[in-house]
Regions:
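Mobile amphipathic helical/loop "lid" adjacent to a hydrophobic cofactor/ligand pocket
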Residues: 61-180, 184-185
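Helical element adjacent to the flavin cofactor pocket in flavoenzyme catalytic cores
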Residues: 185-239
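Conserved beta-strand segments of alpha/beta enzyme cores
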Residues: 24, 51, 77, 221-223, ...
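Glycine-rich FAD pyrophosphate-binding loop
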Residues: 20-44
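Short loop/edge segments at beta-strand edges and connector loops
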Residues: 7, 80-82, 223-227, 233, ...
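Core beta-strand elements of the Rossmann-like FAD/NAD(P) dinucleotide-binding domain
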Residues: 244-250
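N-terminal Rossmann-like FAD-binding beta1-loop-alpha1 element of flavoenzymes
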Residues: 2-27
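N-terminal glycine-rich dinucleotide-binding loop that anchors FAD/FMN and/or NAD(P) in oxidoreductases
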Residues: 41-67
Length: 250
């Protein structure tokens, strides 16, 4: 059977990989690179080249069992990663990192800084409550909930919103508009509300493009990038795939 897979993110790559075991599979990607959220870029620092993942970076064994199985099956090498969080604002006058008391109070002035101490206790209180929060108005946003809980400005602007913005690669105003339900489920499932015993995080050795290239090499058909699919039309014998003013039958 001839099959088309549209999109080369982890869903598209894995679908194309498994279907390729018994069928001819062509892969279509609208972007200029394969991998979707898995995207590695190269930066030059003088004579040194550094490869950086700007999308998919980390995973853990607790919440990514199928991804782990997929990587193991394809002998993708992984290594432990540092999943820490730090903030520095106002020319380092307000800064901390989330690893241990020495990191939290890296600026010793914070020991007597009321604004910082309030943020610190808001973190403990908010995390403890949200880790067990299962009943709530599903229509409200994260910003609505933060206003309802009357947490400090410092907690919102120097902790939670920067963290949400970093995780989902979005500006602060969009982080505030995130549905509370989605935020809670993600943080609960990934152990991000835990103040201790958080899961160990891992990353793909030599960056995520190594796994993308590995899987692409095992897909049976052609790989097309810069090919946005504009329409899929089904008929009694299969489908017509439309792209770039052309169409192809599958």
């Amino acid at each position: 059977m001839k099959i088309a897979v549209v999109g080369s993110g982890i869903s598209g790559l894995s679908a194309a990989y498994y279907l390729s075991k018994n069928h001819h599979v062509d892969l279509f990607e609208k972007e200029d690179h394969f991998g979707g959220h898995s995207h590695t870029i190269d930066l030059n620092f003088g004579a040194k080249k550094v490869s950086v993942d700007i999308g998919f970076i980390v995973f853990n064994f607790e919440t990514y069992p199928n991804l782990i199985k997929f990587f193991n099956e394809n002998k993708i090498e992984i290594e432990k990663s540092d999943m820490s969080f730090s903030v520095s604002v106002n020319d380092s006058s307000f800064e901390y990192c989330g690893r241990g008391l020495n990191g939290i109070f890296s600026n010793r002035f914070n020991l007597i800084n009321f604004s910082f101490l309030r943020m610190f206790f808001d973190i403990i209180k908010f995390y403890k409550k949200c880790d067990n929060l299962n009943e709530f108005n599903e229509e409200i946003t994260l910003g609505d909930y933060l206003r309802k809980e009357k947490v400090s400005k410092e907690f919102i602007e120097y902790h939670l919103i920067p963290m949400v913005s970093a995780i989902w690669s979005m500006p602060p105003y969009e982080a505030n508009q995130m549905p509370l339900k989605f935020f809670l489920k993600f943080f609960q499932n990934h152990g991000l509300f835990r103040l201790k015993n958080r899961p160990q995080w891992y990353t793909v050795s030599n960056r995520s493009r190594t796994y993308v290239e590995n899987i692409l090499s095992k897909i049976s058909g052609e790989h097309f990038k810069n090919y946005p699919v504009t329409k899929i039309k089904s008929n009694s014998n299969g489908i017509d795939l439309y792209y770039g003013g052309e169409n192809e039958f599958f």
